């Protein structure tokens, strides 16, 4: 263990100081310590020093320097998780500044696709939502047997997957929510399908496109054609008024020339106009006699 020239610490001691200051969150003090290190190439290639430089660059917003450090040196797997977080968070922050709004899940996914992790801090295994496929496989296998793991089981799963207990809990909660939503959607579609198959009226309406209660356009009276059925047939087919009382229709609305004459049985081929006048006389004469009686 040799002392560094013109410096009071060994390389191992420098690495230890960097780790302690990082874990304690003393980023400003860590930055000053790194600045005080001598210009020794061997020292500055130490992995703990490089990781400390990356942390300081991130907190100072010097993302270009951060990317340069992460891409230029091969880091040990036990440091990958920490450095991957720095890489992704830095790109998220830059994207949010560029767009002027916070990123959602889709936006973060697009950033990850656009700026994949460098192989210097990534073992090449595909990740999903920052979970390795091996971890997801373990969680899926456990979920198939028990969707509600106990706190002790969650701790065991966290150790087996390299995740935190909170990450394991959130994964199971999100998976249960997705499954419940899928089941509700499938149940709704099944109910709609059953209701349509058991309703013949709805099926006939959907098939023919016409209402069962509606009539066709050909059965309706054409516009502009006079409707004789509302006047003279109603008058002619109504029962005659009792003796001594005038007809209500004859007082207010005497039949006009549009009235349709009704053939008199046994009349043969009588003139319709002559029959029309005789019909008027048969209605008006009793009324006139009644008026004379009332006047006397």
Curated annotation (Swiss-Prot):
Molecular functions (GO terms): DNA-binding transcription activator activity, RNA polymerase II-specific; DNA-binding transcription factor activity; protein-containing complex binding; RNA polymerase II cis-regulatory region sequence-specific DNA binding; sequence-specific DNA binding; transcription factor binding
Coiled-coil blocks: none
Membrane is among the record's keywords: no
Entry annotated with the keyword Nucleus: yes
Consequence of gene disruption: Six2 knockout heterozygous mice not exhibit any obvious abnormalities. However, Six2 knockout nullizygous mice die soon after birth.
Compositional bias ranges of the Pro residues kind: 254-264
GO CC annotations on file: nucleoplasm; nucleus
Biased segments, Low complexity type: 191-206, 228-237
A GO biological-process term: nephron morphogenesis
DNA-binding interval(s): 124-183
Induction of the gene: Down-regulated by CTNNB1 upon differentiation. Activated by TLX1 in the kidney and repressed by HOXA2 in the branchial arch and facial mesenchyme.
UniProt entry keywords in alphabetical sequence: Developmental protein, DNA-binding, Homeobox, Nucleus
Composition skew (Basic and acidic residues), residue ranges: 179-190
Compartments reported by the entry: Nucleus
Tissue note: Expressed in phalangeal tendons, in smooth muscle and in head and body mesenchyme.
Region of interest: Disordered: 168-284
Subunit structure of this chain's protein: Interacts with TCF7L2; in a canonical Wnt signaling independent manner; prevents transcription of differentiation genes in cap mesenchyme. Interacts with OSR1; form a strong repressor complex with TCF7L2, TLE2 and TLE3 to prevent the activation of Wnt/beta-catenin target genes in the cap mesenchyme. Interacts with HOXA11, EYA1 and EYA3.
Family: Belongs to the SIX/Sine oculis homeobox family.
Job of this protein: Transcription factor that plays an important role in the development of several organs, including kidney, skull and stomach. During kidney development, maintains cap mesenchyme multipotent nephron progenitor cells in an undifferentiated state by opposing the inductive signals emanating from the ureteric bud and cooperates with WNT9B to promote renewing progenitor cells proliferation. Acts through its interaction with TCF7L2 and OSR1 in a canonical Wnt signaling independent manner preventing transcription of differentiation genes in cap mesenchyme such as WNT4.
Protein name: Homeobox protein SIX2
Source species: Mus musculus (Mouse)
Lineage: Eukaryota, Metazoa, Chordata, Craniata, Vertebrata
């Amino acid at each position: 263990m040799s002392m560094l020239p013109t410096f009071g610490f060994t390389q191992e001691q420098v690495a230890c100081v960097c780790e302690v200051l990082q874990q304690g969150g003393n980023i400003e003090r860590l930055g000053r310590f790194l600045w005080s290190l001598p210009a020794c190439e061997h020292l500055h290639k130490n992995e703990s020093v490089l990781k400390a430089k990356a942390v300081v660059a991130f907190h100072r917003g010097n993302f270009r320097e951060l990317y340069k450090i992460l891409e230029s040196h091969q880091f040990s797997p036990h440091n990958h998780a920490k450095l991957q977080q720095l890489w992704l968070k830095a790109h998220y922050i830059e994207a949010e500044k560029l767009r002027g709004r916070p990123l959602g899940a889709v936006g973060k996914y697009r950033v990850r696709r656009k700026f994949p992790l460098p192989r210097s801090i990534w073992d090449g295994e595909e990740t999903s939502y920052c979970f390795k496929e091996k971890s997801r496989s373990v969680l899926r296998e456990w979920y198939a047997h028990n969707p509600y793991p106990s706190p002790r089981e969650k701790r065991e799963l966290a150790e087996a997957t390299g995740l935190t207990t909170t990450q394991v809990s959130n994964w199971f909660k999100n998976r249960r929510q997705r499954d419940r939503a899928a089941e509700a959607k499938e149940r709704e579609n099944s109910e709609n399908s059953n209701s349509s198959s058991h309703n013949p009226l709805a099926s006939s309406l959907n098939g023919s496109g016409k209402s069962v209660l509606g009539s066709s356009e050909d059965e309706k009276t054409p516009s502009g054609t006079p409707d004789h059925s509302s006047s003279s047939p109603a008058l002619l087919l109504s029962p005659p008024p009792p003796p001594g009382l005038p007809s209500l229709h004859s007082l207010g609305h005497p039949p006009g020339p549009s009235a349709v004459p009704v053939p008199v049985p046994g009349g043969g081929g009588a003139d319709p106009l002559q029959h029309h006048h005789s019909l008027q006389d048969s209605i008006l004469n009793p009324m006139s006699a009644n008026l004379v009686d009332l006047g006397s």
